[in-house]
Amino acid sequence: MNLCLSALLFFLVILLPSGKGMFGNDGVKVRTCTSQKAVCFFGCPPGYRWIAFCHNILSCCKNMTRFQPPQAKDPWVH
């Protein structure tokens, strides 16, 4: 792979939203993570607590019930 293609791939990957996208993201349901009442993301969004790794790159995140930061509120829900 040449350098230009590697750089393009790198920029596309870092521009992906971690956790919640523009219109929300419910995460991925993996059995080992759902047994702990959590879901998998590419990084825990605000208002979620990191528990473990789901596979190699996904993070198992559980919704915080207490002490949620103000950023955890979904701006699209009124």
UniProtKB/Swiss-Prot annotation:
Family designation: Belongs to the beta-defensin family.
Molecular function GO labels = lipopolysaccharide binding
Which gene specifies this protein's sequence?
DEFB136
Identify one Gene Ontology CC term for this UniProt entry.
Answer: extracellular region
Disulfide-linked positions: 33-60, 40-54, 44-61
Biological role stated in the UniProt entry? Host defense peptide that exhibits antibacterial and antifungal activity. Exhibits antimicrobial activity against E.coli, S.aureus and C.albicans (in vitro). Has high lipopolysaccharide (LPS)-binding affinity, and may thereby be involved in immunoregulation through LPS neutralization.
Protein name in UniProt: Defensin beta 136
Instruction: Tell me the organism.
Output: Homo sapiens (Human)
Chief location: secreted
First and last residue of the signal peptide: 1-21
